[in-house]
Amino acid sequence: MNRLGKSMFRLAVLAVLACVPGMSAHSQDDPAGSVTLVATPRLVDPDYRGAVLLAVPVDNNRHVGVIINRPTGRSLSSLFPQHAPSKLVRDPVYFGGPMLRQAIFAVVHIDRTPGPGSIQIMKELFLATQGTVVDHIIEETPNEARYYVGYVAWRPGELRQEVDRGLWYVLEADPDLVFRKDPARLWEELLRRARAVTAGTPGRLSIVAAFSKD
């Protein structure tokens, strides 16, 4: 890849760590508390209607996450045509959330942190937020990650309030959901599962007590 293409890509893939609430102080070493969020029918905001999110707590009772069932239909190489390694990425880019839509984030399957500013979501699964780290993932292990434009962030205690208002079902985090090849039916599938949980159906999953009441 030529020098111009690489520099343009790194400008577009912003070093956003300092802009992401709760991510500037440290990377999370203990992934306990990561959850799958399933939008309930009460949630009518177009950004979140029918959405499934992977969310993780960070510092100061904040949470961040990405929407995992919204493929954009655009390839990474179509967004960055001068960035040759992007052509190796097979899956489409996903819409991760309404915040920082100009930035690319990655959820990567790897047995160690991929680089500075990355947050461990669960065992061998990390959210990469810095542009240089995302760039490195694309160049070295392009198909061990899923790439997102934008992300979701909650202020301290905000997600707890949304759950209490009945906007989200909360299920255990599942890394397999992130890499589903066809997520078109994922929301309906998890909605049925979540309703079975709340109804006390035999064989139900446990709802995760993931949020502080503070």
Where are these regions (language model features)?
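A short aromatic-anchored loop/beta-hairpin motif
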Residues: A25-D214
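Intrinsic disorder/low-complexity segments
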Residues: L4-K6, P21-S24
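Bacterial N-terminal signal peptides
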Residues: R10-P21
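Bacterial N-terminal signal peptides that target proteins for export
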Residues: M1-A12
